[in-house]
């Protein structure tokens, strides 16, 4: 059976790995997952994200999680827009997360970016997830 919501699966894998205090989490790779992982690295929520080619030409995305004083850096990570109900917002309606302390992941015509970058660029898009 094929996976319907790859981004939701990615976020759930990260959440479960952090609750189990894992060092890293591996998952099948895609361009969307890689760009979301790169955004999490740039925002400081995860240590690194690397794509490796496995046997049979299957790419695997490995995300190294980040902890501070024994606690996970990511407090909450949740899917906002989902396959059954897509959530698109204009540049003025992009929500802030935890009064600016978190980040909303926005899929725009110029790629995946944070809510702050989308507002600065003056473009809206699909609100993929919230991370705080």
Curated annotation (Swiss-Prot):
Coiled-coil region list: none
Record's GO cellular component terms: ribonucleoprotein complex; ribosome
Alphabetized InterPro entries for the sequence: Ribosomal_uS8, Ribosomal_uS8_CS, Ribosomal_uS8_sf
One function term, GO molecular function aspect: rRNA binding
Signal sequence residues: none
Keyword vocabulary terms for this entry: Ribonucleoprotein, Ribosomal protein, RNA-binding, rRNA-binding
Gene3D superfamilies per record: 3.30.1370.30, 3.30.1490.10
Entry keyword annotation includes Cytoplasm: no
GO biological process terms on file: translation
Family: Belongs to the universal ribosomal protein uS8 family.
Subunit description: Part of the 30S ribosomal subunit. Contacts proteins S5 and S12.
Function: One of the primary rRNA binding proteins, it binds directly to 16S rRNA central domain where it helps coordinate assembly of the platform of the 30S subunit.
UniProt name for this protein: Small ribosomal subunit protein uS8
Source taxonomy: Bacteria, Pseudomonadati, Pseudomonadota, Gammaproteobacteria, Moraxellales
């Amino acid at each position: 059976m094929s996976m319907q919501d790859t981004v939701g699966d990615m976020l759930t894998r990260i959440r479960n790995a952090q609750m189990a205090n894992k060092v890293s989490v591996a998952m099948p790779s895609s361009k969307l997952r890689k760009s979301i992982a790169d955004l999490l690295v740039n925002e400081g929520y995860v240590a690194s994200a690397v794509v490796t080619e496995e046997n049979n030409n299957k790419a695997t995305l490995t995300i190294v999680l980040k902890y501070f004083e024994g606690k996970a850096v990511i407090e909450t990570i949740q899917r906002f827009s989902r396959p059954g109900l897509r959530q698109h917002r204009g540049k003025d309606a992009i929500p802030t997360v935890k009064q600016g302390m978190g980040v909303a992941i926005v899929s725009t015509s110029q790629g995946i970016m944070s809510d702050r970058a989308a507002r600065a660029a003056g473009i809206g898009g699909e609100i993929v997830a919230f991370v705080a």
